[in-house]
């Protein structure tokens, strides 16, 4: 698979730590009281204002399907207690207990999962989980969590049908 189109920002981080392994891809949502959309740059600014290193997510997917780069992939995310050293995190903009992910978000998420699974030798089945699978939280929201099997099926399809250059 060819790398997805990923928008990159010039984000500055405080101290970052290397990931030990890549065992999981963990899915998150914004989860605010409103179905709000935030860019990777806006999340980074909020996290820095909290005196954190910067955005805790490796990727953000906007409602229009645009994938945005957060933390560098070689680093630990800051998103899921006990699993930061062994996971990549994808964050979708929106509250998916209130709203639903857009068609564009779902397609981008499936393709990104497929590409990451191919890069790291993972399977979309078993290695892709919702935040709630590891921590006591509603994240990534019922409306997205209920779609993860379907999304992982699309990711698997992309892996089997899109080769480099397709």
Model-predicted segments: where are they?
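Short Gly/aromatic-enriched secondary-structure transition segments
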Residues: 39-47
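Short, solvent-exposed loop/turn elements at domain surfaces
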Residues: 34-37, 68
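A short acidic/small-residue loop/turn micro-motif
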Residues: 74-76
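Short glycine-biased active-site loop of nucleotidyltransferases that positions the nucleotide triphosphate
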Residues: 79-82
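Basic/polar, cationic surfaces and motifs that engage anionic cell-wall
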Residues: 1-26, 30, 63-67, 72, ...
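Eukaryotic intrinsically disordered, low-complexity regulatory tails
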Residues: 55-56, 122
